[in-house]
Curated annotation (Swiss-Prot):
<feature type="transmembrane region" description="Helical">
    <location>
        <begin position="5"/>
        <end position="27"/>
    </location>
</feature>
<keyword id="KW-0812">Transmembrane</keyword>
<keyword id="KW-0472">Membrane</keyword>
<comment type="function">
    <text>May play a role in photosystem I and II biogenesis.</text>
</comment>
<dbReference type="GO" id="GO:0042651">
    <property type="term" value="C:thylakoid membrane"/>
</dbReference>
<protein>
    <recommendedName>
        <fullName>Protein PsbN</fullName>
    </recommendedName>
</protein>
<dbReference type="InterPro" id="IPR003398">
    <property type="entry name" value="PSII_PsbN"/>
</dbReference>
<dbReference type="GO" id="GO:0042170">
    <property type="term" value="C:plastid membrane"/>
</dbReference>
<comment type="similarity">
    <text>Belongs to the PsbN family.</text>
</comment>
<keyword id="KW-1133">Transmembrane helix</keyword>
<dbReference type="Pfam" id="PF02468">
    <property type="entry name" value="PsbN"/>
</dbReference>
<dbReference type="GO" id="GO:0015979">
    <property type="term" value="P:photosynthesis"/>
</dbReference>
<keyword id="KW-0934">Plastid</keyword>
Length: 46
């Protein structure tokens, strides 16, 4: 394969991996540990 093809595949894989990890963090099991600032200060905004 050419160098440009390998670089493109590497960067595409990196982007897909990062996106998958971000989705897992936002909606998967670790999301239970995230705090919700709107829920903490919900009464102050009214």
């Amino acid at each position: 394969m050419e160098l440009a093809t390998l670089v493109t595949l590497f960067l595409s894989g990196l982007l897909i991996s990062f996106t998958g990890y971000a989705l897992y963090t936002a909606f998967g099991q670790p999301s239970q540990q995230l705090r919700d600032p709107f829920e903490e200060h919900g009464n102050e905004l009214k």
